[in-house]
Amino acid sequence: MEVGVGIHIIADFYGVDSELIATTERMYPIIEGAVEYGRLTKISSDYYQFRPKGASGIVLLAESHLSFHTWPEYGLVTLDIYTCGDPKTADDAFAYLVDKLRPTSISTRKIVRGDMIEEAGENQIEEAALH
């Protein structure tokens, strides 16, 4: 059985409006909105504006982090959402980003982090019983 300590969503959004993702000024409210919508706890954030266009940012969360990079020339946004605790928070933040960025296609990987915790615990119990 998978227990894990968190959910890690790694996604590439294709076909996103290049003007929407060209600047930190446009991305900031979208990313911060995802944090709020996902009921995540923001500790700090940092955003970087590339020249002539493109943006990157990271939000440090009590639950872990949310980061992004944009390539307006390709209509591409790459996202990383890692949250510990209730997996619904990551899913909700992700759904918010899909709604606001409106990609034409998405490539997503969802990883359970720390999924061997229970297995490791069982092995330790078995080893202790042998001694």
Swiss-Prot record:
Pfam families: AdoMet_dc (PF02675). The modification Pyruvic acid (Ser) is found at residue 64. Is synthesized initially as an inactive proenzyme. Formation of the active enzyme involves a self-maturation process in which the active site pyruvoyl group is generated from an internal serine residue via an autocatalytic post-translational modification. Two non-identical subunits are generated from the proenzyme in this reaction, and the pyruvate is formed at the N-terminus of the alpha chain, which is derived from the carboxyl end of the proenzyme. GO terms for biological process: spermidine biosynthetic process. Signal peptide: none annotated. It catalyses: S-adenosyl-L-methionine + H(+) = S-adenosyl 3-(methylsulfanyl)propylamine + CO2. Its cofactor is pyruvate. It is an enzyme of class 4 (lyase). GO terms for cellular component: cytosol. InterPro entries: AdoMetDC_fam_prok, S-AdoMet_deCO2ase_core, S-AdoMet_deCOase_pro-enz. Its EC number is 4.1.1.50. One of its GO terms (molecular function) is adenosylmethionine decarboxylase activity. The active site is at 64 (schiff-base intermediate with substrate), 69 (proton acceptor), 84 (proton donor). Pathway: Amine and polyamine biosynthesis; S-adenosylmethioninamine biosynthesis; S-adenosylmethioninamine from S-adenosyl-L-methionine: step 1/1. Keywords: Autocatalytic cleavage, Decarboxylase, Lyase, Polyamine biosynthesis, Pyruvate, S-adenosyl-L-methionine, Schiff base, Spermidine biosynthesis, Zymogen. Binds 1 pyruvoyl group covalently per subunit. The record marks 63-64 as: Cleavage (non-hydrolytic). Belongs to the prokaryotic AdoMetDC family. Type 1 subfamily. PANTHER family: S-ADENOSYLMETHIONINE DECARBOXYLASE PROENZYME. Heterotetramer of two alpha and two beta chains arranged as a dimer of alpha/beta heterodimers. NCBIfam families: SAM_DCase_Bsu. Catalyzes the decarboxylation of S-adenosylmethionine to S-adenosylmethioninamine (dcAdoMet), the propylamine donor required for the synthesis of the polyamines spermine and spermidine from the diamine putrescine. This is S-adenosylmethionine decarboxylase proenzyme. The lineage of its organism: Archaea, Methanobacteriati, Thermoplasmatota, Thermoplasmata, Thermoplasmatales. The gene is speH.
